[in-house]
Regions:
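Extracytoplasmic beta-strand/coil segments of soluble accessory domains associated
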Residues: 72, 76-117, 121
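Short acidic/polar hinge/loop motifs at secondary-structure boundaries
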Residues: 117-146, 163
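Short strand-turn segments of transmembrane beta-barrel domains in outer membranes
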Residues: 148-149, 160, 164-196, 207, ...
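Transmembrane beta-barrel wall of Gram-negative outer-membrane proteins
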Residues: 182-211, 216-255, 279-297, 338, ...
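Face-selective signature of the C-terminal outer-membrane beta-barrel domain
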Residues: 238-244, 282-430, 437-438, 453-455, ...
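Gram-negative outer-membrane beta-barrel transporters
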Residues: 344-346, 351, 364, 407, ...
Length: 696
């Protein structure tokens, strides 16, 4: 028996496939463009990030010491970032990060970049950070709120995550690294990297492979990914070519049903089981990027890069055994995106004031095709063809208006052209609806930013900003938009029509840097119109009544001695409906309170280093529970430990995650018809991982 309605079950399937069928990472860009804009307001003072915005940086050293096994969990140590995982384990597949409380649609409202190039695509699939070789990451920059929309465009609503990768430029002539590991659920993984450097030429390669049986039945994962580049670097000119690719196969175990009305609780009786033993999701991605940087005059650089990326996805959903034909569905989709992003960086005085300008043009051309059939071998019921072209121009400038005060402003205008069509075959097995109406649409949107920072002294800084952003509907949301049936259950054609989501936010806070102590805290508020969400009553995607986010985020660190570093953070996140039938209710899948703490203790001259982290999150509403009538996903906490060390060129680590074996789940989807009935995706208890390797 299904735990939720068929449409809601399809909603859960879509989320599962969207989270795991995600974009392979794009190629690194030039070193000059690989950070969020750097503003040099005097010769002796520089800071990173967008002026007035809340920005956090996770370094390569932080990543190396983190007990967490996935990049998503490492990022979730940043206040204001939540993580939702469908499958747990120690590989990170099926996990998504959420900046500032967007729940099930977090991936569409968090923009992910690789070296300043956007990865978010035309479909609902989020960026699968587990496909990025961990050793290839130099740092991760997180900017929260709307301000990133000026430089990077749509999806930058909750914030921007910029992953900066390593290169071989400036390094030793030859450098190599190998690592192998094994752990819980028969996990086996290995990685290799190499970098060559000779005069102006350099190259690098990072590759990783992983296999695991997974925590649950039908939850095995097999994944391979690699990235390589060649660079030429001279004083006034540099160029690069990068090729990357990944391949993943993942079993989809589905949810565990709980229904007190019939005495059913699979979380207790069969937590690791599956009701969907045949469901799967596969993904293959190939990406090529090339570009150059040319110094035009002192302080001015022309940066031009472009690329093409291909993503193929296949997923099959067959339901429980014995398989029933009405439960069967198969999807085979392909997406190709071409991009060209020339920009100009100018760092010169303007009317005697230090000035930093970044201006440019972004062009993206994406083509999507998806065959939707009952089985892989049968004729497609629907063939969806969508193409989307965006052309944008932007300008952002930061001025040192006083010796201790910086002001920034910027704007972006973006034209989006969409062409969407559906070919429906009524004779195909499983056909029961009708063909969607075609849609051709042109739309212009804009984003704005204004920010201010003032340094009272070397210790205390205040900052504030206001911004606006937008998010265009993606292809999966358009396919599932509008009613499929009328009141008499007669099929009606879809329209692909959804309104563009818009938002406006403000933020203010302070930073402290006093010797070994550092802290940052901010308050923010965000109002959204036409937020795109799934309606659990009408069973299709729609634009919501106006919604709101507000809260606070605080982080701090203290080095109490050379070997010991303490760190921690706390965030209060409110995501609520501000109008309509659900006014005052929480947006599902958003915890109001999250907190973390950690310690790094160098016990013995890097031969033995102890790292420990604790992460807490409060209860949250289940997906589908906008009406706030169902049980909450319970609050919980996990403790992770890691012992690591290095001697000469050899290194090792032992990690224990979820030390106290907490039994929890991040995601559940509620029934809209039966009180107390839901499907949950249980996560693993205590897990282990042992790794060892060497450098050459």
């Amino acid at each position: 028996m299904s735990s939720v309605s068929p449409a809601a079950r399809r909603r859960a399937r879509l989320l599962a496939s969207s989270v795991v069928l995600s974009l392979a990472f794009a190629a690194p860009a030039l070193a000059q463009s690989s950070t969020l804009p750097t503003v040099n307001v005097t010769a002796s003072r520089a800071f990173n990030g967008i002026t007035g915005a809340s920005t956090s940086v996770i370094t390569a050293d932080d990543i190396a010491h983190a007990p967490a096994q996935s990049i998503q969990e490492i990022i979730a140590q940043t206040p204001g970032v939540q993580v939702t995982s469908l499958y747990g384990g120690v590989h990170g597949a099926g996990s998504m990060i959420d900046l500032r409380g967007f729940g099930a649609f977090a991936t569409a409202n968090t923009l992910v970049l690789i070296n300043g190039r956007r990865l978010n695509d035309l479909d609902l699939a989020g960026v699968d950070l587990s496909s990025i070789p961990r050793e290839s990451i130099e740092r991760i920059e997180i900017t929260k709120g709307n301000s990133g929309a000026v430089l990077y465009g749509d999806n930058a609503v909750g914030g921007v995550v910029n992953i900066v990768t390593k290169t071989g430029a400036g390094g030793p002539p030859v450098k190599m690294r190998v690592e192998a590991g094994g752990g819980s659920f028969n996990q086996q993984q290995g990685s290799v990297s190499a970098a060559l450097n000779s005069g102006p030429w350099s190259s690098s390669f990072y590759g990783t492979a992983l296999k695991s049986d997974g925590y649950r039945d039908n939850n095995a994962v097999s994944q391979r990914s690699a990235i390589g580049d060649i660079r030429y670097t001279a004083p006034d000119f540099s160029a690069f070519v990068t090729l990357s690719g990944d391949d993943q196969r993942l079993g989809l175990p589905g949810g565990r049903t709980v229904d007190p009305s019939i005495g059913l609780n699979q979380l207790l009786t069969d937590r690791r089981g599956t009701s969907t033993p045949l469901d799967f999701a596969d993904r293959q991605g190939v990406n090529v990027t090339a570009g150059f940087t040319r110094t035009l005059w002192d302080g001015a650089e022309l940066i031009v890069d472009g690329g093409v990326r291909n993503k193929d996805q296949q997923s099959g959903f067959f339901g429980s055994l014995p398989v029933q034909s009405f439960n069967e569905s198969y999807m085979d989709s392909s997406l190709q995106t071409w991009s060209l992003t020339p920009r100009l960086s100018i760092r010169n005085a303007l009317f005697g004031l230090p000035s930093d300008v970044l201006t440019g043009i972004d062009y993206y051309d994406a083509a999507y095709r998806s065959n939707r059939s009952q089985l892989q071998t049968t004729t497609p019921v629907h063939v969806y063809d969508l193409s989307q072209r965006t052309l944008a121009a932007y300008w952002q400038q930061t001025l040192g208006i006083l010796p201790d005060t910086d002001f920034s402003y910027g704007g972006r205008i973006q034209r989006t052209s969409l062409d969407a069509r559906d070919r429906f075959d009524i004779t195909a097995p499983g056909a029961f609806d009708v063909q969607a109406n075609p849609l051709r649409q042109d739309e212009t949107q804009h984003a704005l930013h204004v920010g201010l920072e003032h340094r009272f002294n070397e210790v205390f800084t205040v900052f504030g900003r206001a911004a606006s952003a937008f998010r265009t509907p993606n292809v999966d949301e358009r396919v599932a938009s509008g009613p499929s049936f009328d009141a008499s259950f007669n099929a009606v054609p879809g329209t692909f029509a959804l309104k563009t989501q818009t938002s406006r936010d403000i933020e203010a806070g302070f930073r402290i840097k006093a010797g070994a102590f550092a802290a940052q805290s901010s308050l923010y508020g965000m109002d959204l119109d036409n937020e795109i969400h799934y309606n659990p009553v009408l069973f299709y995607n729609t634009n919501l009544d106006p919604t709101r986010r507000y809260g606070s985020e605080t982080s701090a660190s203290l080095r109490i001695s050379e070997p010991v570093l303490l760190r921690g953070g706390v965030a209060v996140t409110r995501a609520v409906f501000r109008e309509g039938a659900f006014a005052g209710n929480d947006i599902p899948l958003v915890s109001r309170l999250t907190a973390n703490a950690g310690v790094t203790w160098n016990l013995w001259q890097n031969f033995v280093v102890l790292d420990a982290t604790v992460r807490y999150w409060s209860s949250r509403r289940m997906d589908n529970d906008q009406a706030a009538t169902q049980p909450l996903i319970p609050a919980n906490a996990t403790v992770d430990l890691k012992l690591s060390g290095a001697w000469d060129r050899f290194f090792w680590s032992l990690s224990v995650n979820n030390l106290f074996d907490a039994m929890y789940y991040d995601y559940a989807i509620a029934s809209t018809a039966t009180l107390g009935r839901f499907n949950a995706y249980p996560l693993s208890g205590r897990t282990y991982m042992v790794k060892a390797g060497a450098t050459f």
